[in-house]
Structures are given as structure tokens and as C-alpha cells.
């Protein structure tokens, strides 16, 4: 059974219980979609906790962070499935690694208590816009 439904709308208008999006692990300032989300849900801005050039403050690839309480704060899932921003170009952040990290993030999401009774909105082409992934491959992981 396919649970993927593509909706042509602004992600910020989504009515789903969770919004999940792909993040990189090192940026200290959000751009593009992450900036839009963090501007609207500042409690989910993991980038502002980071210190430039301090690896101890970076996120770890293949992990997720969940922000919000589902009541007064909408749930936001930050999926750390790329190490650097933009397209993959370094040996420690390859296209294959990003795909693997994305899969691992999906596994973490599947283990959220009561997730089977919840809905999740993700941006169309997640992992494939500025990150440069192949939607034909990524979309299959979501179905």
C-alpha cells in the first residue's frame, strides 16, 4: 500500500502532525527551506546552537531531532542526512552516503512512538533540490 500523497501547496500550510525536512550538519545560518521553517518555528532551529568551526556543536549524519510538543508547538523533524550544505562534493559527504543517511533518518522516524497514527509532511523533492539528490531514487524510499 502506498502512503505517499503529493500535495501542491506551501509546506508551511501543511496540516499534518509533523513537518520533516532535510538538514545539513554544520551550517550556523539556515538558508532556503530551512530558513523559512526556522523563521516560522524558531524553536526548531538547530543551526543557531552551532558554533562555526567547532565540530563538537555539529549534528551527526543519519540522526534526527524532533522539536515541538504537538500542542502549542508544531512537531518539526530535522533529518540530518547531509553533512555539508548544497550538493555533495566531498569524500565524507557523497551522494551515496546522503542516500544512506536519509534511509537511516526514515528508520528513526518510523520508531517515533505512535507515528503510525500520525501524518508527516515533507517538502516535494526532499534531498533533491539544493542537495542535488535524484528524486527517482528518494521518492522510492518514501513509498
Regions found by a protein language model. Name each.
Residues 1-143:
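Macrodomain-like recognition of ADP-ribose-binding/processing modules
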